Amino acid sequence: MYKRQHHYCAALADRGYVVFNINYRLVPDVTVNQQLQDVARALRWIRDHGSQYPCDMQNIMLTGDSAGGQLAAYSAVLMQSAQLRKTFDTVNPQMELTALLLTSPVAFMRDGGLFSLYTKPMWGTDYKDKATYPYMDFDQIIDYAQALPPTYLITSSGDTLANKQTHRLYEVLQAHGVQAEIKDYAKAEYNQSLPHVFSVLQPFEPAGTAAIDKALAFYQQAMTAKVAQ
C-alpha cells in the first residue's frame, strides 16, 4: 500500500504481477483509524472486482512501507478479528492473504521510541481517550489473529527511522509462530547506507531491484507452500 509510489508499483507489474495501488487519506487530515477504514474498503473493492483483472485472487500479497507497512500489518490482523474490526470501525474485506511484504514498517506507536513524536499526529491528540488506545503497538493486537500469513520484512543500515521497529516486529512475529524472514541490508553490500524504504523509492536501482526480487521469491515460496498444504 502506497500513497503515490507509482514507480514501485510499476516495478512489481514489470515482473508479471497484477498490482492494485491503494491510496488512503493522509494525516493530519485523518488518523490511523480512518486510514485503516480506507484500506479495508479498498481491499473489499479488490475482492469484489478482482475477477475483472487477470489475477489470482487466491494468492494475494499485501505490501506497504513505513506507515503503510503499519497499515498493512494491522489490516492483516483486522481481517481475522471481528472484535478489532468493530473497535476500529472497519468493514470486513473477506479476503485471505498468502503473504505480507513489510518495508520498514512502523508498527509500534504507543511505545515507539523516535516514532512517539508522531503518535498524536497519526492517532489524534485524544488518542488516550479512544477505544483503540490499547492497540497502538502491534504486539497488543497480534493475538487477535488466528494465523498471520508468511511475512517478509526489509530494512537497511541507513534506515534510521524504522530499523529498530522492523527488527522488533520481526521478533514479535517469530515469538507468535508466524513464518517470517527479515533482510537488513548492511552498508557493505552496496558500499552505501541504504535509506529508509530504499526499495520503494529506488526500485530500478541495483539495491532496490535485488530487494524486490528477494521479496517476491519469498512470495513465490509462500504460494508453493500453500498449494502443498
Model-identified regions with their sequence ranges:
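Alpha/beta-hydrolase superfamily serine-hydrolase fold, recognizing
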Residues: 3-229
